[in-house]
Swiss-Prot record:
Belongs to the astroviridae polyprotein 1AB family. Residues 130-222, 758-788 form a coiled coil. The modification O-(5'-phospho-RNA)-tyrosine is found at Y834. One of its GO terms (cellular component) is membrane. PROSITE patterns: RDRP_SSRNA_POS. GO terms for biological process: DNA-templated transcription; proteolysis; viral RNA genome replication; viral translational frameshifting. This is Non-structural polyprotein 1AB. It catalyses: RNA(n) + a ribonucleoside 5'-triphosphate = RNA(n+1) + diphosphate. Cleaved by the viral and host proteases. The protease is probably autocatalytically cleaved. The active site is at H600 (charge relay system), D632 (charge relay system), S697 (charge relay system). The chain crosses the membrane at residues 220-240, 379-398, 407-427, 437-457, 479-499, 507-527.
Amino acid sequence: MAQAGRSGDAFASLDQRRERQEEQAQSGLDKVFYFQGVVELFNRMKIAYGRTPAWTALMKCNAIYLKDFKTAVGVEGTRYGLFFAEEVTKPTWSPDIGANLITLGEKACLDAQNAKYERLQASLKTTSGLVHQVMEKTREAKENLEKANKIQEQLDKVIESNKALHRKIQERNREKMQEYMVRLHNTQKDRDDWVQRCSRLEQENVTLQKRLKEKENALVSVGWDLLGWIVISVLVFGLISLADAQNLTPPAKIVITPGQAEFMDLAKLEKIQVRKYRLDSCELPPEKGCVLYKDYLTTRPVSFLELMAKCSKPDWVSESSYNETTLMEECIQIFGAEWCEGKLVDLVPRKCGEQHVLVNIIEQIEKTREVVTLIYGKVMSYRLDMWITSIFSLVLAGNKEKLFKMAPFIFVAWFLNIPVFLTCVAVNIFPVVSLPFILFQIFMPQFVLVNAFLLWLTLTLTAFYWSEGPKILMEISYALVYTIGFVLWSLGLAVGVTLKLTMVHQILMFCVVAAAICGTKFACTTITVQHPDGTTAKYTRVGKLKNNVVNQCKKVVTTLQTRGVIPATPAKTASIVIVEGKNGTGVGFRFMNYILTAEHVVQGSDIATLKNGSVSVKSKVIKTIPIFESVDNVAVLKLPPELNSVKPIKLAKKVQSDYLTLTAYDPNFQHAATFTGWCIIDGNWLNNSFDTKFGNSGAPYCDHDGRLVGIHLGTQGVLSQGIVIVDALKNTFQLADQCRPQNFDMDEFLEKVIAGTKVSHAAILKELEELREEVQFLKKKCVTYDDYWLCQTIFGQAKGKTKKTVRGRKHLVTKRALGKGHFMKMRMLTDEEYQNMIEKGFSAEEIREAVNALREQAWLNYCIDNDVDDEGEEDWYDDMVETDRVNQEIDEAIERAMEDRGEFYQKKSRLTFVEQAMMHLIQVSKERSQTAKLEVQKENEAQLVKMFERCVTDENTPEGTTSIAALSTEDDVRLVEGKVIDFTKAKNIPVDGEIRREIIPGTKCTEISTGPENKKNILKKKDTHIAEGKVETKSSQQPVDVKDDKPVALEQRKPRACKWCGSSQKHDYRECRFQREKRFCVYCAAMHSMFEGHIRPIECTSCKKSFSGIEKLEDHVVSGECQKKLIEGPVTTKAPTPVPDWLKIFAWEDDILPPEGKTALPENVTLIGHIPVDKLVSRTKKVQDPLLGLVTPWKQDMYDSTTWTVKAYTKMFEKFHYHDPVDFVEQYAEFVLLCDNMVLREHDYMANSNITPIMSTEKNVNSTPAYPKFQAYDSEAEYLEDCGWQEYLDVVSDPETINRRPLWWCFLKNEVLKREKIEDSDIRMILCTDPIFTRIGAMFEQDQNNRMKQQTEIRSAQVGWTPFFGGLDRRVRRLYGDGDRYFVEMDWTRYDGTIPKSLFWRIRQIRFFFLHDSHKTPKMRRLYNWYVKNLLEKIILLPTGEVCQVKKGNPSGQFSTTVDNNMINVWLTTFEVSYLFFKQRGRLPTEKELQENCSMICYGDDRLLSIRKGFVEYEPDTVIDMYKNIFGMWVKRNNIKIQDTPEGLSFCGLTIVKSSTGAYVGVPNVNKILSTLENPVRRLPDVESLWGKLVSLRILCENAPSNVKHFLDEQISNVEEFAARENIQLPEVGPDFYSRIW
């Protein structure tokens, strides 16, 4: 009953699926007889009549012929029905009168279609019966297996009881054995303890003896040190007692201000002096006046008036600024001698404040200095320095040996009155052998050279006789060093004696010389440590500490930078949907197979509406998940099948405060929107820092890995909050573990499974044998040998064993016709390729389109290679779906039967083509067919390659024999045809075990080698002898009869003629057939081919307008040009046309011819070759536009549209040879480093930029595709429409690409120029190359370019800026900074062409450095370097056909010309300012100084610079000379302007002026832009375009003089009047339109 129930459910689901298919737009199309245009006609009729009973009756027919929009004929059995719609709303169906309205040909086609449908139904019934039989057999086998399992369970119980008894016996014996072992172990342990205790006691005795000896030595050393310090202390305190402390304190100086002298007497004055000492301790608060304090820094003298002002209130006056004589003179000069007498008697002590604590400290320091000076004087007077030096030298000797050596030399130094310290230094430094020489030098200083020579001889001989081995060389080297040191010491000694250096000077001289000699070399010595494993490591003593400090600082900086930089986050817009409930609308997202949202969004609703794009479905609310501490919950909705394309979001691995992204919709729910910012996790609450909108409730918060963290609940006032749901979702959706006992033993469980498998193995094999017999029966039903081979392919190999891509592989060796459905379900991408496309940002729809395009291409290649007619393949999709549905269960049963078997079978994971290497050998002749297929693991790939080389010989196959040998590994793919194959060398490779051989009836001989983790190497071999009428297989037990007695042989490919045009030349066979095959035309109502053309003219039935083709008529109707519109049908997808070899990117290498002589190239440019091209060389005629007759020309004679001759091509090469640059990287290394840092700092927003997939890059598709593609296509859009993206993908993935060179196409720019430039043939050159090369550059740079466009308000580069709406004003005011600046305008001449190669390469490497680390793979690095190399070293094709090479400059037609020029401009400007700064100040400026004192804006080579006055003086002549001699770049003097204000300077063609409101606005070059009204560069299409051009000019000239605006207003008025007369509608422009834009 359960089986019947499941069958019923299956048929019920089948009926539901069939109903859904009938509701689809294409349902019923497979029944329609095909002719050209039938798809569009069918869709229009279905839309018009799809809901009428007549149309329903028509769709029930087996075959349908659509005669026209109102008439159709349907066949069901032998009845021919007629569908006729006299009115759109009332069509009729007549079931028996249709045969009278069709021709015999049409009737034959309908009969064929009807017969095909009936055959399909009969086949389905037959197949269904076979499916039912297989399922019944399978069910019986399962029942038998269950019975066997029950028996096995009973046996297991008996075995388990025996095992339990056996275990008890073993446990008892084990316990006794363990008891004996414990006793033995305890005994051994006690013995070991006694041995260890004895050894420890011995070691302690030795250690105590060593310590005792060390203490004795330490006491002796301490005694000597104590004696020395006692002597020093006695001397120091004795000398201090000699000092007179009273003389060190100067007497206080106290003055009384005027007005208080009469109240003071001498007694009081003495009291004040006493108070002065108290004043120093801040105890006496004076009432009024000044206190004179002693200072130690000279200050400005105080004037009399300043003194009176200070002393009118409590204040302090420094002693150095108080000069009584000067003050008295000033007073007498101002007030007279009489008044001034007695005014400056003395100062009264006043207030002592906290600010004068420093004064007390300075006084204490001064007193200390005086004490020290006095002590030092006493020391020198009594020659105590000699005593102190001697005592210190003896105390610091360190050991007795040095003490006894120095004592006599100190006595000698005292006796001869020579420096004691220098003598002690010599005794300590030089070896013992040199002591006699030192003594001799003291007594006889005039023989220094002889003495040094004798010392050197003595030390060298001593080293030779006293040392051994390599130490001799070291000692000899030391001898030389000691000798040099001895000479220096002798000179120092002579200087000391002559100059009578004091002790302090001797010590200072020695320390300075020692530090200069040693430096920091020994402190920073690198130590090499060799580890036991053979590795070495180097450590630096000081460097290690330095590195630790640097690393800690870097960590702090990185943390601060990370906190302020928003990381890149994957877009999750494909994972959200709109959720509509009864009370509101919110956002939902997919998690697993559910849609989650906030509960309040669907509150009160059991059913919610989910929307995603154009899909809108209903879904049921399954449950809610409560969230701790939250008033809201998470609602869980069922995922409808229609939303399976919505991508699920994975849970976050770690939840912490970080930058999170909220993915939601805009307020109108039209487009997805993302909000990124810093979010704080507070328990379960999530607080964000960005503004959200109403309707964002339920949106997911994702981390920078795109994983789910929380859900948005809403906005509470100014605070937007969400809730963390990671733990809640883990607890809710976590799968429950299977319950098992605590003492569960997995090994024991596996043993039971193995035992059960052995018991039931025979029964399973019996069932398998029965299934094999049924398979053999199905094989015998095959009516042709081709069907047999197809059946052999299906049943002989389980699906999924190997996964290959169709691109570039050879098809099966037999000549059998495959259907289109076979190709449309093939795997076109490996897992690796598919994952790479996902990581590069391709959506599911884009990947699906790319795969379908590859499938279409594979099908077309198959049809052309095998001369297969693809007629009738329009219904491939329905046939494929129906076949898959019928054969699904048969495939599953056959796969189970054909799996590898063993005693214990564990199904292994299927290995894909990427994961498992494979060798496939096929050799077929008329009498014999041999195949061998070997699949091995990755670790056996090398053995497989060697076996392949042994099997494939160098001998060619004889006539009538064909062979193919294929090898596929992870890194190599080989295909060899036409060579004799030695099948005896094809043997299996053992993994880690024996090779098991099996004979599977009806298939092949199979050898299996199984290793650990069920890894297997499988060899399948087959040897078939072909006789008349039979196929005999050696390894098969039963012969298989085949009705088709054709021999199986592979025909060698040979030239064939096209059956449509008769040509044997290679061409587009599909297009040829499409043009010449006759089809029924719905417009002509007759059979004809596209080559013959339509019989009657094609015209619109509404406006009677004629067209040359049906496509143009359809475009006319759909575009709405006429009032009557047809219903637009679906856009038909066209399979891409294979790209001919002569149009591919590197095809120019085959087209180039030897040089034929120069036509346009100058002498200094080398001619490489010649390629004939049919392009315009000279332009002598100007464009004539009749529409410009409506306007009056602007009067000017300066500008004109360009014309040129061949001379212009010669002239344009001058910019590449203006002047050669120097090696500025080596000569100006510090400047280069500074410039690099400034460029990195200026463009740091480009960091961690991403690579854009080549199919997602954006560029102008209407531009020329360059050579060789412009030979067939005028634009890239046309090329993509025909050929698709395949060549783009092949070039990027092909490793040989970096070994090829693209070709640049050169042409002159048609623009408005000065007439003298036109007369001088000075026309700008444009370079462009193949769009594939351009898009490779866009892969690396599109993200960076877009980021630069977003930074124009705060950065220098102005790509994407606008001068309107105050844009120019804001940028000019940014240049002002904090004022006090001057402005510099500079424009290079031929900027692009003169950029040094090394500078351009440097900027390009900086751009690669800004890429995210995940993109900096070796492959991407090689591809990027190849791209940059071809930007620098360009191979150029001229319209004259000449091919040359240029190795300088930035090509103007590359993807990032302006962005690169901006970065180079920043680099050069930094160098320019630093060069002037260095010249004027003798040092380089710092980065901070440059940022604070210089600002700039630039667009390509256009630059406006502001410099703070006093920072650097701008010297134009120096700048011009610098650019020429260092970089080889051209700057003219008249292109440099320096002003204090920006008014009058220009930027991007706009002269800066101030408007009446005080804002900075721009005025264009009026004569240049208005000259196009007389001499245009291209014609305008219509009057509307002319009006738009005039309005645009009027916007630009809003700030120009009034006569210019008046002129343009008149021209606009004239055009508007003309348009009104001709009934042409033009937009209205308001009165303040132009001014508001600025």
